């Protein structure tokens, strides 16, 4: 089990031996801190909710996904998730190619170091694994 702040990640399949797919279970407690919206330079992502309700956004579409519901994210598309509901949300996340469990271990170490996360280290780690933080929302003039 990999802890990233309040989130729990349990890898079921990591890329290797010719396999490009990564698959993990993601547990998101109610009202937990989650990663900021971001995109993956080269990874497709599929999220399938197993338990609870997960709010998931891909581009401009936001849905509250129930068990059995899914959303997919093409490479380069901004996406994010949250759990504003009263119960734990659990989802199966599939990436191709795999980002790798080591990414989550590194981010977990940065977040778990105490105090506010080191933004420079976090951005460097994200960049190394092909994650691109979304820019701030556009403002009306």
Per-segment meaning from a language model:
Residues 87-141:
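Double-stranded beta-helix
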Residues 25-29, 39-57, 94:
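Short, conserved beta-strand element in jelly-roll/cupin
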Residues 19, 55, 75-101:
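Ligand-binding loop in jelly-roll beta-barrel domains
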Residues 60-78:
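Short acidic-glycine-tyrosine-enriched beta hairpin
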Residues 59, 67, 82-83, 103-104:
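Short glycine-/acidic-enriched loop or helix-start segments at secondary-structure transitions
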Residues 8, 46, 53-55, 62, ...:
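Structural motif
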Residues 2-37, 43-44:
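A short glycine-rich, His/Asp/Glu-containing loop-to-beta-strand
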Residues 20, 45-48, 103-106:
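Residue-level recognition of specific faces of alpha-helices
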């Amino acid at each position: 089990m990999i802890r990233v702040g309040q989130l729990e990640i349990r890898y079921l399949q990591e890329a290797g031996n010719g396999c490009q797919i990564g698959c993990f279970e993601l547990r998101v407690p109610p009202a937990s801190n989650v990663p900021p919206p971001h995109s993956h330079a080269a990874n497709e992502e599929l999220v399938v909710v197993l338990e609870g309700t997960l709010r998931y956004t891909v581009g401009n579409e936001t849905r509250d996904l129930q068990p059995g519901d899914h959303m997919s994210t093409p490479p380069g598309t901004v996406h994010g998730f949250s759990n504003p509901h009263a119960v734990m949300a659990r989802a199966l996340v599939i990436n191709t190619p795999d980002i790798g469990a080591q990414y989550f271990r590194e981010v977990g170490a940065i977040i778990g170091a105490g105090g506010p996360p080191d933004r420079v280290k976090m951005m460097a780690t994200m960049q190394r694994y092909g994650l691109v933080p979304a820019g701030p929302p556009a403002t009306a003039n």
